[in-house]
């Protein structure tokens, strides 16, 4: 169904595969918000295999994303998002997009930026993630304080990822990702 320009693995604090999948979620929020979410989040534990370089098959995608996780888009206050970021720091990184976190090697949050701007406690932000995390699993209980939560029918992470690969392929593009310092250890 497509081609990967590079081997993509998972792992903290950030990785090629987790960056890619978080970005797919962030973009998928368009179907809920009419625009991408401020950030995307996927847990490393939800990614079960590497994406090899070269041909991508549907089977590869099932191996990477074997769970029936669905998209959820949450609207959260900055104070609650900060708690979410503290949880991500304590886990030494998860798959994120749209944000930049500086954490310590002991798992403490030092600085947080959404887009290019420092996180503001009183602002509302949108987060695209999977239902498993939106339900407060994986230490993400900050999501339970969300102001609003929308989980569209039939928007599985696997389906969204397959759609993304097919769309890129139709445009003649290979699947790529990059490490860009979205989570750094200071």
Indicate where each model-derived feature is located.
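Feature captures C-terminal
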Residues: 15, 19-186
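Glycine-rich phosphate/diphosphate-binding loops and the adjacent beta-loop-alpha structural elements
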Residues: 1-14
